[in-house]
Amino acid sequence: MQIRLANPRGFCAGVDRAIEIVNRALDVFGAPIYVRHEVVHNKFVVDNLRNRGAIFVDELGEVPDDKLVIFSAHGVSQAVQNEAARRGLKVFDATCPLVTKVHMEVMRYSRDGRECILIGHHGHPEVEGTMGQYDHSNGGDIYLVEDEADVQKLEVKDPSRLSFVTQTTLSMDDTARVIDALRAKFPQIEGPRKDDICYATQNRQDAVKQLAGDCDIMLVVGSPNSSNSNRLRELAERMGTPAYLIDEAAQIDPAWLYGKKAIGVTAGASAPEVLVADVIKRLKALGGEEPVEVSGREESIVFSMPKELRIDAVEL
């Protein structure tokens, strides 16, 4: 039974940065520190940080006045930022810079009084943060659509002053169809200068497209609440390859592998490589051969840390 590994897979630059912010804050300021929302959507990562003294909360009201708080990689609304400032909380913002880019687009549209459509998944923290960047005081509004059916139902105030942005972790193919529907219904709509779907999401989806057709089954390492991990599973299934989303190696059902000759393995952008290694170990114990790395796009992007948490600043 062959084991084929997708490339790239696993951690992206934004996730690396967010986790490192929490770890360095714990090193510098000591436990406990508070994190608004799970810093990234991965159970293994969150449990490890919790064991180090990170306390994950849903609302700022759960953070004592004298404690440090970190905003998750998914970003927060202007209202949350304003509340933190009003209370004088010490904040480190672990929002992915690519999410911040979308926030800036939304703020620019709202300043210009342009209505804005966000393509994204209802209830996802990134969507809540992005929607919360829009200032309605200039007469515009922001709308959320998930699919083409939502586009058909949508009514806006002024189709001649309309823009769109997207959540960064969506399916590229699904998003392209929604954008086509928007352009068909609102011919004057303007989009971002550069695609909002992040490089890591695109690269990992491309890697699955390259791999899934040659495999009898795909295993996606990632947590159920990880948007980008779910999109990888859906993509493999859309290509006709059975796919399973697993948090850890113990969740692999040997029955999935019965009669299979080639197993593809990938990991969402919030899943650490140690979990992939555990999956490979279990697959080998179940009859798998030595894994083969499938070539893919190399990633070299690194996002800088907040100044106060940089190693040179800490050492001083």
Curated annotation (Swiss-Prot):
- List the EC numbers from the record: 1.17.7.4
Tell me the superkingdom of the source: Bacteria
Which reactions are catalysed by this chain? isopentenyl diphosphate + 2 oxidized [2Fe-2S]-[ferredoxin] + H2O = (2E)-4-hydroxy-3-methylbut-2-enyl diphosphate + 2 reduced [2Fe-2S]-[ferredoxin] + 2 H(+); dimethylallyl diphosphate + 2 oxidized [2Fe-2S]-[ferredoxin] + H2O = (2E)-4-hydroxy-3-methylbut-2-enyl diphosphate + 2 reduced [2Fe-2S]-[ferredoxin] + 2 H(+)
Q: What does the UniProt keyword field contain?
A: 4Fe-4S, Iron, Iron-sulfur, Isoprene biosynthesis, Metal-binding, Oxidoreductase
Is the tRNA-binding keyword given for this protein?
no
One MF term in GO for this entry? 4-hydroxy-3-methylbut-2-enyl diphosphate reductase activity
A Pfam family reported for this protein in Swiss-Prot or TrEMBL: LYTB
Cofactors:
[4Fe-4S] cluster
Kindly state what the record says about how the cofactor is bound: Binds 1 [4Fe-4S] cluster per subunit.
Sites where the protein binds [4Fe-4S] cluster: 12, 96, 198
Pathway annotation: Isoprenoid biosynthesis; dimethylallyl diphosphate biosynthesis; dimethylallyl diphosphate from (2E)-4-hydroxy-3-methylbutenyl diphosphate: step 1/1; Isoprenoid biosynthesis; isopentenyl diphosphate biosynthesis via DXP pathway; isopentenyl diphosphate from 1-deoxy-D-xylulose 5-phosphate: step 6/6
The EC category is: oxidoreductase
Q: For binding (2E)-4-hydroxy-3-methylbut-2-enyl diphosphate, which residues are annotated in this chain's numbering?
A: 41, 74, 124, 168, 226-228, 270
Q: Family, per the entry?
A: Belongs to the IspH family.
What is the role of the protein in this entry? Answer: Catalyzes the conversion of 1-hydroxy-2-methyl-2-(E)-butenyl 4-diphosphate (HMBPP) into a mixture of isopentenyl diphosphate (IPP) and dimethylallyl diphosphate (DMAPP). Acts in the terminal step of the DOXP/MEP pathway for isoprenoid precursor biosynthesis.
State what protein this is by name. 4-hydroxy-3-methylbut-2-enyl diphosphate reductase
